[in-house]
Amino acid sequence: MTPARPLGAFGAVWFTYFAAIGLFNTYAPLWFKSLGLSLLVIGGIASLQSWTRVLAPYGWSWLADRNGQRIRTLRWASALALVAALALALAGPLGTALIVACVVLLFVANGAVVPLSEASLAHHLHTERGLDTARYGRVRVWGSLGFIVAVAAGGFVLQGTGVAAFPWFVVATFAALLWMALRLPASHDTVRPHARSEVGALQVLRRPAVAWFFASVFFTVLAHTSLYAFFSLYLDVLGQAKSAIGLMWGVAVGVEIVFFWFQGRWFERLTLHGWLVAAAGVATLRFAGVALFGNSLGLLALTQLTHAVTFAAHHAACIALIHRHFPGALRARGQALYSTLGYGLSGVVGGLAGGVLSEHLGFAAVFWAGSAMAAVGAMCALRAAHHERAAAPAP
């Protein structure tokens, strides 16, 4: 069994990383606005995170799998992120071009953290049956806690200090991330440099079960883009109070935390593909409910409770399936494909399409589209399960 100390180190990395992301994504637009940037420019800067996720995670993971040092690569990327955050704090008053350059560098560096830490943690949690999903949930929960603590505390702190202090808080969180990355155990997380598997990552991706799995990931996460990018705006247009909007987000993150912590108690009740189908199916109903009941906080709260299944259960099942399909030297690149196809490409497509839909048909149309995409994700998950069974050796 993996000792608690390495798992605690991974939990600390995820706490600080998601704290940094939560702080930046929530309050950076306010800082940019204080610098005199237009809403169009601020929106463009915000979209850079999705654009960099299309290539950066796979690039970092390819490098780590080739040099055989995932943790060391993660540490270098964390150091680069700290340099980018410091440069952003200093360059803020100097012009838009410098701000954009620093943000791009920051997001590119961040692209290493999730796939490399996920792959390294999976190495520590490997069992004869695959990934130990119960212990994985106990570690992953710290990322959710870091996010909600940073967003809540950041609001109170910036209320007192003023938004001008924002970039220095970002610097502090990325300094903490580097410190935690330096504490990660690296001695048992190496693959042979330049080791070549019998098949490459892209060859694995072309297998029907894997291709349908990633198609399901893409459409299910694409459906969630309606939530991440447009939920707050939708409720604001409907006249809901800012406190109510914050409460709705708190409900979602709260049930996410509960699921991750206790997932070992019920995760075995379905197959991994069964969880994918359940998550996408529930998401189909969830986003239809948001479209229909935006004026009812009670019903909206019920839809937010399903975040435990549509995000937390879906994510845990995805990580376990990637662990199964991409072993050994391919593991980091498998995690990177998840980041790229699931959260990079889907974020770009969802942001652009959602913007067009909301502009011409209103925000409710965005959530109806999200419901439709989730239904497609469920069908893709069913196809993935079919091909997985077909490829399994006969008993």
Question: Whereabouts are the PLM-identified features?
Answer:
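Juxtamembrane intracellular "pre-TM" segments in multi-pass secondary transporters
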Residues: 1-4, 184-217, 237
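Helix-loop boundary and gating motifs at the non-cytosolic
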Residues: 2-52, 210-248
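Hydrophobic core of transmembrane alpha-helices in multi-pass small-molecule transporters
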Residues: 15, 84, 95-114, 218, ...
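Interfacial helix-cap and linker-helix signal at transmembrane-aqueous boundaries
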Residues: 32-33, 63-64, 141, 156-159, ...
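Helix-to-loop junctions at the C-terminal end of transmembrane segments
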Residues: 55-69, 158, 258-272, 358
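C-terminal ends and interior cores of transmembrane alpha-helices
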Residues: 79-94, 282-295
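Intracellular juxtamembrane helix-capping segments at the cytosolic ends
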Residues: 111-128, 313-326
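Symmetry-related core transmembrane helices of the 12-TM Major Facilitator Superfamily/SLC fold
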Residues: 165-182, 365-383
